[in-house]
Every structure is written in structure tokens, then in C-alpha cells.
Amino acid sequence: MVIFMELSEAIAKRTSVRFYEEREVNDETLKELIKAAIRAPTASGLENWFFVAYKSKDIREKVYELIKQGHIEYFTGRGLPEEKMKKLLKRFEEGMYRAPLYLGVFINKNVRALQGEKYNELEFYFALESAAMAIENLMLKAVELGLGTCYIGVTCFEHIEKELKRMADLGDEYFLVGLITVGYPREEPKPKRRRKSAEDVLKIL
């Protein structure tokens, strides 16, 4: 598989994709995504990330229901009006977030450089930062391969994370950073313009 794209083009094209074709993401493509992810910077060289591919049909259906459940819980907590909640549920009926591949991105909290309770928070942040950079690498590689992705944060609700770990037979030392939907976009992705410019978010000293 030889596909090349300018990095600036991949960055510009990356956007959250929520609707996918039924076409499978094969194992070769999956491995290309993970290879890109693990080239990310990693604090203390620990590489304490771990990826779970929820890929079989039955497993994907269970994950999809967890995503739906998480969104209902999230928007209920935000006080979403009933009419808007109905629209959200209609989008799920239309297949929103139903993907041929879900990637769980975890960190292993037991893999660390600094020992001792006083460093727990710092080491946790280091691991999160490493995983976040790996996720961006993965997403940009996905653009190059003609795939779409979306970061699903609601799966980090404790009861949903627990179920995702149970499905993957992972112990308490693992922490879910996020779930990524992966697939071929149903429609041509249309990246949105950012509300803030580089000048708005930059301070030069």
C-alpha cells in the first residue's frame, strides 16, 4: 500500500466524520494506522499506549449501543431540550457513528518512569499527552488512506469505560483515553473553518 499526501493537505482535510459506508477496514489498513500512531512522541520513551480494535460484527454492535447510551447521558446532563434529543436519536437511527471499526485508545498506568504516590498525577498526565499525540497521528494517517475518523469522548463515562475494558479483557491498570470511529466516509467530508485564527490563539514574547 503506497499512498502519499502532503502533511499540510492531510491536516486541512481532517474533520470529524460521523457517517460511514459499510465497507470493511482491512487488517493491513488497520496496522498502517497503528504504525502511524506509535510514531508519536511518548513521555520518557515509555510507549505506554495500547490499542484495541473492536472489529467483529457482534462486538461493534455492542460498542455502538454504548456510544448511543453515552450520548444520551451526556446531552441529558447538559439539559438538552426534548425536541433536540429526538433529533439526536433520529441521527442514530440514520446510522450516526455506526462504523466498520472502533479503536479504543488506552494507557497503562503501571508503566511509568517516576515511582511514588506523589508522582501519580504527573505520570498520568504524561501518559494522556502521549496517547493524545498518537491519536492525532492516527487521524492524519487515516485522511491519507481515504478514511474518516471521529473522537468519541462520551465513552469515558466510568460505566462505559468499564464495559469496553471488560470486552477487551483489560485490567484496572488500563485507562481509556478515547474511542475512535474509523471507516470510509459516506459522503465527502467538509472540514469546517475554525472560529479563531492563529493570531487569536498565539502570544509571541
Predicted ranges, named:
Residues V2-E24, E28-E32:
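Short acidic N-proximal helix/loop "leader" segments that mark the beginning
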Residues E9-A10, T15-V17, F175-L205:
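C-terminal helix-cap and adjacent tail motif
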Residues T29, S56, V63, E161-E163:
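Short Asp/Glu-rich motifs
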Residues E32-L33, A37-I38, L103, K109, ...:
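Small-aliphatic-rich amphipathic alpha-helix that forms the alpha element of a beta-alpha
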Residues P41-G45:
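Glycine-rich phosphate/pyrophosphate-binding beta-alpha loops
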Residues L46-N48, M96-L101, F175:
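Short connector loops at helix/strand junctions that flank enzyme active sites
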Residues A53-A131:
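Glycine/small-residue-rich phosphate/adenosyl-binding loop
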Residues G70, E161-T181:
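Short, conserved aromatic-histidine micro-motifs
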